[in-house]
Amino acid sequence: MRIAIGQVNELTEEFLTFAKQLGLDDVQMNLYNLPTDMKDTGRLEFMDLLRLKTRAEERGLRLIAIENVPIRFYDKIMLGKEGREHQLANMQESIRNLGRAGIPIFGYHFISTGVWRTGWETPIRGGAISNSFKTELAKHAPWFYDRDYNEEEMWANYDWYLERILPVAEEYNVRMALHPDDPPVPKLGGVPRLFRNFDNFKRAMERHPNRMHGLDFCHGCWSEMRGGAGVLEAAEYFGAQGRIFYVHMRDVKGGCDDFTECFINEGNSNIFNVMMKLRQVGFKGFIIDDHVPHLVNDSAYGHRGRAHATGYLTAIMDVVNQLQPDPTPSASKANDLKPAILAKTPRKKKPSNTPPVFKPPSKRALAALPKDPMVKGGGKLK
């Protein structure tokens, strides 16, 4: 378990220097700036991915994950519309190219209408600027697409996609990490939002148990779901199965019908207890900050806000490491599956439905954990 840096769409010299100054080794990119030709092809290209990975490595960093592609790359897949086969072929080739380039994780979502907020300049502590959401202001929004969609057809579309993309992901050693819907409400813009609660994530993992299928555990979204309740239970359930591939660590005040993103140390959850729980269940992936408040004189990327969040997470990590040392510290990066050999087509392997299993901590280590972790706040299950 380690802290990384991410939510960046370009590996500028300034960003790479910032990462090293924070003492981090791993980089995640989110919806990176696409070359003009890639915008037309609708897929991630091998040479572009290789250039990104090489640029990070030249500065002593690892490009560990690419998260998200433009919604237009797979909107027909999500909605079950004509043309989805063409988009599927492009997404399959994108996965192959990630594997060929040695980038082991692809973070994805199934949110055809995107992230919604009803307030983008919400003042929080000390006048910092954040964002917020109120269901009351969004529930009457018009259809985002051509009609109103129902939940079961969205599940059918999701199953169709996963059945066809996961065998490619397994062949090329690329793990697919599912992000929750944000906000996690039943429907917005006429389209159901499937990944809004524990039961639906459980359904997705059970229906597609391939070892390459897991979670981008966005703590902020899980905190939104029930006002902070249930976060530890979800981390324990999916973490013990080895289904949490990496973590977005942010927090909110409130629940899914009315919440405000806040500083990481003042939200619904006790972040220390969350990270301790992740260590307890054997999580060995990386944790990054996520959305951060915009501080005075901050940059567009939010360097000040991110330095605050990353420093906070690093300090907690240090304490967690002291209270429960990793019994196999050399394996901290071994959790990232070995990438396919560069530019060489790997052998086809029979798909496996067995998730990776992590050895639980010893009884002595468990006894050292805090009892009855406290979660602040509350909310109704949606």
Describe each model-derived feature in a short phrase.
Residues 1-46, 53-54:
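N-terminal basic, low-complexity leaders that serve as flexible interaction/assembly modules and, when applicable
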Residues 2-4, 9-11, 16-20, 57, ...:
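Histidine-acidic metal/acid-base catalytic patches
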Residues 24-32, 66, 108, 134-135, ...:
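Non-cysteine beta-strand/loop elements that form the S-adenosyl-L-methionine
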Residues 29-30, 70-73, 140-144, 179-183, ...:
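Generic detector of short, locally flexible boundary/turn motifs and exposed helical patches
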Residues 30-159, 170-171, 221:
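Structural motif corresponding to the early beta-alpha repeats
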Residues 71, 111, 181, 218, ...:
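Short loop/turn motifs enriched for small/polar and acidic residues
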Residues 138-154, 180-190, 295-297:
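Active-site-proximal beta-alpha loop/turn segments in soluble metabolic enzymes
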